[in-house]
From Swiss-Prot:
Source taxon at top rank: Eukaryota
Keywords recorded for this protein, A-Z: Cytoplasm, Metal-binding, Nucleus, Ubl conjugation pathway, Zinc, Zinc-finger
Positions annotated as zinc finger (RING-type): 49-94
Pathway annotation: Protein modification; protein ubiquitination
Annotated localization: Cytoplasm; Nucleus
Protein source organism: Dictyostelium discoideum
Name the UniProt record assigns to this protein: RING-box protein 1
Reported function: Component of the SCF (SKP1-CUL1-F-box protein) E3 ubiquitin ligase complex, which mediates the ubiquitination and subsequent proteasomal degradation of target proteins. Through the RING-type zinc finger, seems to recruit the E2 ubiquitination enzyme to the complex and brings it into close proximity to the substrate.
Amino acid sequence: MADVEASSSASKTPKKKFEVKRWNAVALWIWDIVVDNCAICRNHIMDLCIECQANQASNTSEECTVAWGICNHAFHFHCISRWLKSRQVCPLDNRDWEFQKYGR
């Protein structure tokens, strides 16, 4: 009787409809900024700013982050911080500067 129950429960297991043999994942990544260079130091926005490059030998520099304004222009945080000490406007469009976000 135990043999009959074991075989009947095995037959109730649903058969696989398909099996994934290989998975090639693809990702798409886009910028939401128009310019990918910092207009202040001219380095690529994802590279270190000139201040962080100079401090790289001492290894005491903070993480070099990117800062976006509400005008959607992006600069290195260190670069725009130095700029804002003298002028409170975006270096590219001369609008009043407000941070939209900052980080990587």
